[in-house]
Amino acid sequence: MKIWKTVLLLAFILGNIQSYAQLNSKELQKEQTTIISGLTGASKIGNNKVLKHRWDIQSRTIARNYLANWIEKTGLKIQEHPYTIKYSWFKKIKGTNIYSIIPATNSSDEYIILGAHFDSVKNSPGANDNATGCAMLYGLAKKVTALKTRNKNIIVVFFDQEEIGCVGSLAFAKFIKNKKYNVHSVHTIDQMGWDKDKDQNIEIELPTPTLKAIYEKHAKLLGVSALTTKVTSSDHRQFRASGFNAVGITEEYKNRDTTPHYHSSTDTFDTVNFEYLSFATGLVYNVIEELITK
């Protein structure tokens, strides 16, 4: 009889844990939906502003402040990283990244960088590219902040001006290198809202063998695949060029299950698969959780 009581008690506890996890997942998905709605002009933000794109200085500033407010809701402090980059022999580019540091709970000088760009191309709402990446980054920041044990520090960064040649990430990679941060790995997110075939697979771009193995492991545990590609067209490339272990994370860009609305006026809020975004957020979080708690 005692054994049966114990079994029932365990079942009750596990059921409550599962229900709590599902509730948290639904709550986070709702927040991610709201973030993308604001970034894409589907709803008003700031002083009743409607973003048609995130291309010019004014729209990027509004988007940056909007994301800063969301991150600060998690209790984190946002810092600005203004930069000036030589774009060509006759032109310099100015922009501003924003970042936050989630400190380790134990003494550590190691850092993991999580990043996503917040700008879009001109005349595109940029829902999939890359409001989805920003929403995933927010979700990761919120979940990591809630961890009781963190054996590594986390830097959460929103990059400016990816769409003109990954300029913001280039500036941030140089900033981190000049500061001599001991960086374990860099994980950048770009386009995470399309899954027409509903297989929930993700792609990992140019991962190191160690990062490849851990992403594949956690994907397999969830019954999906993390497919390796050699894509170099997003922010991870700037960190690789600076000598860091970096990986890009995206939907099936090379495996032909990616948004048909890329860099167009039809890359709108209503084209985003929020269930897929939520699932992929959980997958990437599982990877990061293992990396910072082991």
Regions of interest found by a model, annotated:
Residues 41-103:
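A non-catalytic alpha/beta surface segment that caps or lines the substrate-entry region
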Residues 197-294:
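Active-site-adjacent substrate-binding region
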Residues 94-95, 120-222, 226-228, 236:
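Acidic/histidine-rich catalytic neighborhood of metal-dependent amide-processing enzymes
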Residues 27-38, 58-78, 132-139, 143, ...:
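Extracytoplasmic/secreted proteins, especially bacterial periplasmic and envelope-associated proteins
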Residues 7-16:
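Bacterial N-terminal signal peptides
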Residues 22-61, 119-120, 189, 257-268, ...:
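N-terminal capping segment at the start of a domain
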Residues 38, 79-80, 97-101, 111-115, ...:
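Structural recognition of the beta-strand scaffold that forms the well-ordered cores
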Residues 84-88, 105-107, 118-122, 161-165, ...:
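Solvent-exposed loop/turn segments at secondary-structure junctions
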